[in-house]
UniProtKB/Swiss-Prot annotation:
It comes from the Bacteria. Keywords: Aromatic hydrocarbons catabolism, Isomerase. Its EC number is 5.3.3.4. It is an enzyme of class 5 (isomerase). One of its GO terms (molecular function) is muconolactone delta-isomerase activity. This is Muconolactone Delta-isomerase.
Amino acid sequence: MLFHVKMTVKLPVDMDPAKATQLKADEKELAQRLQREGTWRHLWRIAGHYANYSVFDVSSVEACNDTLMQLPLFPYMDIEVDGLCRHPSSIHSDDR
């Protein structure tokens, strides 16, 4: 199942800079691993915002939820999730 996810990061202004740096490094490491595994299929920065649009390829709604909840920045994110299905006019054979 494919899910379109908008993630907006909202770190507290009084967060210790060292903690913020570590959280971002941990997030990057996990995000890149999930991309290599094929779970996190697409990742785009939203220009001018500390936010991204992503596409996740997981087995279920629960798997999507579990994947998002393991992200180190999860407690500091506003997240919107929409399920996706293949469009009948798409010419791409890898749409699922």
